[in-house]
C-alpha cells in the first residue's frame, strides 16, 4: 500500500516538473520563439515568428526594446546547407542573407562539424569576425528549461565553445548552445558581446 501511495506521489510530481520536448515537432510556420536578451545593461525580448522552413528558413522578428524595431530575415537554400557565418545584429526591415550567412539556425555542415566532440569546425560568430574553431567537447548533454504554450518543458541542448589545437576549450566566455537535432538545429543560448536565451515557444 505504501509503495502504491509513493508511486502516486511521484506521478503527481512528474506532472508538475519539466518534461522534455521535441522542437522538430513544435516549430512550424506560425510558431513564435521568444528569446530573452541582455546587452549593454539592457534587457528585452527578441520574438521570432517562423514564416517558412523550406526550402529555406524565413522569419519575422521583433525586439521589445523600442517601437518599430522589427523586420524579416530570409535565408537561401544554400545557406541552410553550408553557411558558416552568424548574423547576430538585426537591422529593421527586410533582409535576405547571402549563401554564407545564417541567423538563429545552424547550417547542416556546421551542425555535423559541431557534433564531433573535440574536433570542431571553423565558423564566424559574427559577420566580419575572424573564423574560430568552435566545437563540442563533453558527452553530457544539458537541458534548457523553457515554457511551451505556458507549460513547463525542457529542451536537450549541446554546448559549443572555441577550441584550441588539442580540442579543449580556450579560456573565454564566448559560447552557444543548440538544439540536438540535425533537422531543427536552432540556437538556444549564446554569449558573445551579448547574452541570449530561448525562454518560451508559442504554437497557438
Model-predicted regions and their roles:
Residues 4-17:
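Sec-dependent N-terminal signal peptides
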Residues 21-105, 109, 113-204:
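Acidic, serine/threonine-rich low-complexity disordered tracts
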